[in-house]
Amino acid sequence: MGELFRSEEMTLAQLFLQSEAAYCCVSELGELGKVQFRDLNPDVNVFQRKFVNEVRRCEEMDRKLRFVEKEVKKANISILDTGENPEVPFPRDMIDLEANFEKIEIELKEINTNQEALKRNFLELTELKFILRKTQQFFDEMADPDLLEESSSLLEPSEMGRGAPLRLGFVAGVINRERIPTFERMLWRVCRGNVFLRQAEIENPLEDPVTGDSVHKSVFIIFFQGDQLKNRVKKICEGFRASLYPCPETPQERKEMATGVNTRIEDLQMVLNQTEDHRQRVLQAAAKSLRVWFIKVRKMKAIYHTLNLCNIDVTQKCLIAEVWCPVADLDSIQFALRRGTEHSGSTVPSILNRMQTNQTPPTYNKTNKFTYGFQNLVDAYGIGSYREINPAPYTIITFPFLFAVMFGDFGHGILMTLFAVWMVVRESRILSQKIDNELFTMMFSGRYIILLMGLFSIYTGLIYNDCFSKALNLFGSSWSVRPMFTDTWSEDLLKHTSVLQLNPNVTGVFNGPYPFGIDPIWSLATNKLTFLNSFKMKMSVVLGIIHMTFGVALSLLNHIYFKKPLNIYLGFIPEMIFMTTLFGYLVILIIYKWCAYDASTSMVAPSLLIHFINMFLFSYQDTSLPMLYKGQMGLQCFLVVCAIICVPWMLVVKPLILRRQYLRRKHLGTHNFGGIRVGNGPTEEDAEIIQHDQLSMHSEEGEEPAMEEVFDFGDTVVHQAIHTIEYCLGCISNTASYLRLWALSLAHAQLSEVLWTMVMHVGLSIRSLGGGIALVFVFSAFATLTIAILLIMEGLSAFLHALRLHWVEFQNKFYMGTGFKFLPFSFENIREGKFDE
């Protein structure tokens, strides 16, 4: 349970794998997913490593599978996913897989080539069929006298004078419909109006044999005179990618050709159907095994990639690897190595040897489906340093609670909870569907965050007594107006006063606090906002200071664990004193005033703001301002002096002690060896004992002795000054930052009230017969706006503000976030279908 609050303890281990067993051992480690391999060949080009040929073969198989997958998806065939996790094939099985994939690829390419040729032939015959059909109509129109008059410009004047018969040449073809207007203008300009074009649309779209898209085309016939115009027309048709077809001149020949074309189309359609059936059978057979093939190939590829990270022994019989792994999983890792050795048939066992290192290990926080989302929220700010306190367990409660303080509405909380419950209940089915929608996937990953946000919103909504901007009268109001009529309000007062105030000092008016939350009578009061603003503002300050103080307290656990006594005495203690003497005292004042003053003494209750300002100014001369309690002046002066003392305590003392320790080590001749200091001085982070940790995160090179420790007093003073100023000013600014809890809560309540008043109230106010029908549309609009504005937009706003309060105001008190994530070699992503590497 303790590891939940810190990252797992990691160790660097060395693996000695026999060459014949290395493949199977790495395979078992990939199934386990608990080791992160280090690259022991950083200076070797990826194309010069030992297993580069095997990687290329896997990539070639992967390419063939992607081709098959593309063809399967193009045919709208679903890929079978049984959730099976196939075992990694042995290296000797790669030849069979390659042959199988090669056979499928060649067969599919042959089918596609033949099918494309058949479809192209089918398209040509179909176009010819429409040409023969349409041209007959064109030739029938040639007998029309109007056509002769329209085409008279095609004849030479001498021929017209001699009354020679009209002898015109023609070409017929098919062109894309959208090119017709440009095509017609080009013919007219190039041929100077000496051609006659007739065109008709083909009603049914034709299929492009290459892309498979539907294309709309038109049939055209061009009449001209002379070979020169004929050549021009053909060149223009070629430029516009029009398909020209031979068309007989006599009706009888056209009829005979049409009959032959129809017969060939029928035969070709039969062949096309048979080809498509065969293609479907091949693709359906491939679709059944495609996912398994993908997993096998990509597991093999991942294994060979990992083997390329290892060193080869000089005898070529052993591979040496270095891995980061959790100490708690060493037994399971050794068991996986034994299992891999047995599968390979090797008689020499693999060896796991723990290594001593001064390099910073990666950070590994174990998660489950519930804590996964909260850990991601923390990691988005920065990966925690190795073994420091993990904020995620505390964030599980504080994050949804602070969100709910801003979002608090009973009705909206129920809607959010129902949505989260739906995702949680159906999570298995949703996971199996592998939805690609990025927005939904993101929300589904945070389903438990949304669930807790909804539950806490219900809780805070009950405290605020706010449900869709309306109060719930669950227990009956504790206020009564009847005593005011009998004892205080006269008839004359009632006639001339529009706003009346209930006096809690009158017996019977106020009967004690409401059992839970805000009394519903406040929803009717004109000073509702005044009361709620005061309550929420003070509550925000109290919650914020408690949250920050808890963050400072967590820093103590880090200092104790890392054995840094200087940070405790010169960091944690003055920080905690500074926080509690000023802002902790403010919380006590707020609670004290709530308890010390009731309705009868509220008129003389002093202002906390004035008292708090006077506390810093040491201003107590104003006798008209009553004290909150006896001895207040002396206590407040003492608290301010303590807070002031904490500033030089944090600023000056630590650099001086570090300098004194450095001079003492230098005098005694103490040196650093391999990053580990040998001497009498206490361990301290600012002395930079392990100097090359940051470099090791990037270089991952072999361990080298660290250089002799260098201490710069000026840098240390500047660093400490920045930290002190940041903390002292941060306490003030961060406390003010928590007022966003009040501001967003107010905004959400006001938006909810506006939406009810402007939409739902209007629908409920209609008294006519059509009011019921109108209410249906009004409620639809109300529900849509509620979800879009109040749940999604306002919810996202509250989410981001709660995130900021955790990242900045809370985590900066104890969380370094300068580590790097543990990225184990694992087949999990491959099993889940996330094939992209």
Swiss-Prot record:
Superkingdom of this protein's organism: Eukaryota
A GO-annotated cellular component: clathrin-coated vesicle membrane
Cytoplasmic side: 1-388, 427-441, 555-572, 659-724, 810-837
Membrane topology note: Multi-pass membrane protein
Pfam families registered for this protein in UniProt: V_ATPase_I
UniProt KW keywords: Cytoplasmic vesicle, Hydrogen ion transport, Ion transport, Membrane, Synapse, Transmembrane, Transmembrane helix, Transport
Transmembrane spans: 389-407, 410-426, 442-471, 535-554, 573-593, 639-658, 725-749, 771-809
Family membership: Belongs to the V-ATPase 116 kDa subunit family.
Subunit details: V-ATPase is a heteromultimeric enzyme made up of two complexes: the ATP-hydrolytic V1 complex and the proton translocation V0 complex. The V1 complex consists of three catalytic AB heterodimers that form a heterohexamer, three peripheral stalks each consisting of EG heterodimers, one central rotor including subunits D and F, and the regulatory subunits C and H. The proton translocation complex V0 consists of the proton transport subunit a, a ring of proteolipid subunits c9c'', rotary subunit d, subunits e and f, and two accessory subunits.
Predominant location category: membrane
Function: Subunit of the V0 complex of vacuolar(H+)-ATPase (V-ATPase), a multisubunit enzyme composed of a peripheral complex (V1) that hydrolyzes ATP and a membrane integral complex (V0) that translocates protons. V-ATPase is responsible for acidifying and maintaining the pH of intracellular compartments and in some cell types, is targeted to the plasma membrane, where it is responsible for acidifying the extracellular environment. Required for assembly and activity of the vacuolar ATPase.
InterPro entries, sorted: V-ATPase_116kDa_su, V-type_ATPase_116kDa_su_euka
Name of protein: V-type proton ATPase 116 kDa subunit a 1
GO molecular function: proton-transporting ATPase activity, rotational mechanism
UniProt topological domain (Vacuolar) ranges: 408-409, 472-534, 594-638, 750-770
Subcellular localization: Cytoplasmic vesicle, Clathrin-coated vesicle membrane; Cytoplasmic vesicle, Secretory vesicle, Synaptic vesicle membrane; Melanosome
